[in-house]
């Protein structure tokens, strides 16, 4: 007997974007250089090389990326708080879900 397809919950497009880690900021900044230095490397291999390079950094070299990560975390927490407040106040944050739209249509 085939499994029934799970209905996944639609993600609200207005949900704040998650905060990035210090390593992600490092990866974004260094991926292109790593790609030119290793032109035959696959995406996964580049990730491994970036991870190895990240582990070799001193705490002083990591600091700018960690600062960016702290600032991004503050941004995320601020935006998430605003988003949660809007939800609690009943403000619409995006398109209505299918069940909510069906219920609204049924009431009319």
Curated annotation (Swiss-Prot):
Q: Does the keyword DNA repair apply?
A: yes
SMART domains, A to Z:
HMG
InterPro entries attached here?
HMG_box_dom, HMG_box_dom_sf, HMGB
Recorded phenotype for the gene knockout or disruption: Double-knockout with abo1 exacerbates the sensitivity of the abo1-knockout to methyl methanesulfonate (DNA damaging agent).
Against Gene3D superfamilies, the record matches this protein to: High mobility group box domain
Renumbered residue ranges of the record's region Disordered: 1-20, 61-108
| Gene Ontology biological process terms in this record | chromatin remodeling; DNA repair
Q: What is this protein called?
A: Non-histone chromosomal protein 6
Its source organism is: Schizosaccharomyces pombe (strain 972 / ATCC 24843)
